[in-house]
C-alpha cells in the first residue's frame, strides 16, 4: 500500500517536524529527573515492606493515573509489554488470531501480540502523525478482509482479525477518532498502545481512553518513570476486574 519509502533525511525531517529542535543540540530520547523527593519516597516504600504488586504507593499511583487521565480504572503491572499482553488477552485475543499493529513502533507492540499466541498483522503508518494510518487501514481491510457472523477474517489466511493496536508515537496522538470509526465498521476491538503518550490529549480527551482499554509504560525512557512498570487504563468495570485478577494472581 505504501507508494514510496522515505530516505533517511526525509524520515529525520518528519521526526524533527513532530519533536522540534533545540538549537544544534541533539534531542535526547530520555532524561530521567530523579531528585531528593523521589529518594525519600522510595526509602519510605522500602521501609514499609510492600515493594511488589500491592501496597499504599501502588494504590496511590493507580488512583492518580485514573484521575489524571480521566479513566475509571488504572491497574499497575510490571512493565508496558505486560500491560499490553494482559490487555489483549483480556479483550479476547486468542491464539491463531491476527492483530493489526502499526509498521512504526517499538518491538514490544508486536511482541505482546505474539505473547498471546496471535500473529501481528502490520498496517502502514501515517508520515504526518507517525501512527497507524486509519485511511490506509480501511482501504486494506475492504480489499483483504470480510465479516462473517460478526467477526472479521483475513481472506488470504482465513484467520480471525480480532483487534487493532494503535500506538501514539513519541507521545504524538495518531488519528484515533478516525481509527475508532474504522474499528466500528469492521467490528474490531481497539486496544491503545499509549506507552509513550501520558500527558497527550486529543482535544480534552487523554490518549489511551478512546479504545476498550490501553497500556502505559513507565520505563526509564518514558515521560514519567518508575524505573520499570506499566499500567492498563479502562472505563469498563468488568474488564478492569478481569485485568486486575490476571495481573495480581495469574
Regions found by a protein language model. Name each.
Residues 73, 95-98, 241-242:
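Short acidic capping loops at alpha-helix termini that bridge into adjacent secondary structure
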Residues 89, 93-169, 173-185, 189-194, ...:
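PLP-dependent aminotransferase-like
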Residues 192-225:
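Conserved active-site segment immediately N-terminal to the catalytic lysine
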Residues 50, 106, 171-172, 220-226:
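Nucleotide-sugar-dependent glycosyltransferase donor-binding/catalytic pocket residues
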Residues 1-90, 94, 166, 184:
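Conserved PLP-binding active-site segment in aminotransferase class I/II-type PLP enzymes
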Residues 42, 65, 83, 99, ...:
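Generic structural signal for small/hydrophobic residues in well-ordered secondary structure
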Residues 8-9, 220-250:
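Conserved core segment of the aminotransferase class I/II
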Amino acid at each position: 500500500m505504501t507508494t514510496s519509502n522515505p530516505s533517511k533525511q526525509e524520515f529525520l525531517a518528519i521526526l524533527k517536524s513532530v519533536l522540534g529542535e533545540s538549537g544544534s543540540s541533539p534531542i535526547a530520547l530520555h532524561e530521567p529527573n530523579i531528585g531528593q523527593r523521589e529518594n525519600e519516597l522510595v526509602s519510605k516504600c522500602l521501609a514499609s515492606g510492600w515493594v511488589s504488586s500491592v501496597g499504599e504507593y501502588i494504590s496511590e499511583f493507580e488512583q492518580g493515573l485514573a484521575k489524571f487521565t480521566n479513566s475509571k480504572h488504572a491497574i499497575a503491572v510490571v512493565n508496558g509489554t505486560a500491560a499490553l499482553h494482559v490487555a489483549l488477552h483480556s479483550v479476547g485475543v486468542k491464539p491463531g488470531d491476527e492483530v493489526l499493529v502499526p509498521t512504526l513502533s517499538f518491538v514490544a507492540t508486536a511482541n505482546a501480540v505474539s505473547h498471546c499466541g496471535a500473529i501481528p498483522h502490520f498496517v502502514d503508518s501515517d508520515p504526518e502523525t507517525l501512527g497507524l494510518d486509519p485511511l490506509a487501514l480501511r482501504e486494506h481491510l475492504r480489499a483483504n478482509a470480510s465479516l462473517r457472523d460478526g467477526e472479521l477474517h483475513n481472506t488470504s489466511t482465513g484467520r480471525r482479525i480480532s483487534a487493532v493496536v494503535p500506538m501514539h508515537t513519541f507521545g504524538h496522538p495518531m488519528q484515533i477518532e478516525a481509527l475508532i470509526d474504522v474499528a466500528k465498521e469492521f467490528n474490531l476491538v481497539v486496544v491503545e498502545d499509549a506507552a509513550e503518550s501520558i500527558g497527550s490529549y486529543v482535544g480534552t480527551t487523554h490518549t489511551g481512553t478512546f479504545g476498550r482499554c490501553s497500556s502505559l509504560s513507565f520505563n526509564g525512557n518514558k515521560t514519567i518513570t518508575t524505573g520499570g512498570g506499566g499500567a492498563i487504563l479502562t472505563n469498563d468495570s468488568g474488564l478492569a476486574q478481569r485485568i486486575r485478577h490476571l495481573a495480581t494472581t495469574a
